[in-house]
């Protein structure tokens, strides 16, 4: 793992001892914010609740959407990010997606990154008042990478680059993708950065049933009915026509419908299953 933390070490807070015997050191509190796509906006409510009860983290580490929420908090722009999140509607979310037909992901990611930078600004991680890091995965090696320097939006973008959906992000000489591939809820990273108490937020818990195995009875090979077979043969041609058609059709193909999931929903659901299993193994 790449551990290049060069930021300032936050001073340990001292609180008066109730019996007048000097001071008592507060433990260093770490926050590990997990991935989970749109479910991750729940991290905002959790952060506000912690702060309302006087629990202020000294270390924040985020994976995927957790990196976005954690970075906004560390930079002091949680309100702006929440305002933007609340403004998202099905009719305008597509405007943030720069669709690509010949890249390593369906979405380039530049539009979304620009919107995040408009909300958070060109802040550097090493200039933040608290320790902050994001978790990403190196594509070629599978190594877990901790991003602790550079532009905060770049670190966020690398951490949420869901394979197949978003294009990988080049950081230094490494191509990085979503950190949830290796560490969905980065408790280990928070501890490595000095947290003595870690509050972990796993928004993907119980999304899928635990330990459920479904046995299918029947033949292992199913021969489709003639009309089904002809439908399957015609599907690729229709897919190509739709791919180059109007925006409304592209939205339908990308997000899918109740009857048939789209490309995005299939990939995200598959990723969520993997993420849930890894999280349960690591926590």
Regions found by a protein language model. Name each.
Residues 1-60, 267:
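Helix-rich "cap/lid" substructures immediately adjacent to catalytic or cofactor-binding pockets
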Residues 34, 43, 56-75, 183:
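Catalytic nucleophile loop
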Residues 120-131:
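A short alpha-helix-loop-beta-strand transition element characteristic
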């Amino acid at each position: 793992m790449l551990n290049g933390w060069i930021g300032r070490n936050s001073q340990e807070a001292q609180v008066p001892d109730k019996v007048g015997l000097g001071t008592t050191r507060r433990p260093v509190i770490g926050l590990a914010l997990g991935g989970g796509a749109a479910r991750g906006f729940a991290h905002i409510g959790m952060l506000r609740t912690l702060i309302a009860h006087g629990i202020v983290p000294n270390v924040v580490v985020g994976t995927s959407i957790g990196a976005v929420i954690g970075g906004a908090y560390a930079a002091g722009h949680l309100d702006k990010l929440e305002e933007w999140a609340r403004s998202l509607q099905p009719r305008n979310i597509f405007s943030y997606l720069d669709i690509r037909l010949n890249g390593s992901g369906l979405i380039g990611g530049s539009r979304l990154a620009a919107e995040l930078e408009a909300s958070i600004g060109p802040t550097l991680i090493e200039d933040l008042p608290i320790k902050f890091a994001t978790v990403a995965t190196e594509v070629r090696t599978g190594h877990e990478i901790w991003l602790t320097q550079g532009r905060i939006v770049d670190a966020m973008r690398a951490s949420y680059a869901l394979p197949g959906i978003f294009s990988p992000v080049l950081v230094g000489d490494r191509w990085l993708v979503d950190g949830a591939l290796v560490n969905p809820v980065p408790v280990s990273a928070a501890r490595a950065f000095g947290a003595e108490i870690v509050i972990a937020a796993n928004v993907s818990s119980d999304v899928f049933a635990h330990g459920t195995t479904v046995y299918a009875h029947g033949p292992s090979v199913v021969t489709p009915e003639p009309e089904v077979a002809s439908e399957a043969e015609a599907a690729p041609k229709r897919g190509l026509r739709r791919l180059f058609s109007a925006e409304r059709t592209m939205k339908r193909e990308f997000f899918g419908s109740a009857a048939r999931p789209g490309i995005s929903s299939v990939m995200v659901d598959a990723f969520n299953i993997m993420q849930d299993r890894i999280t349960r193994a690591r926590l």
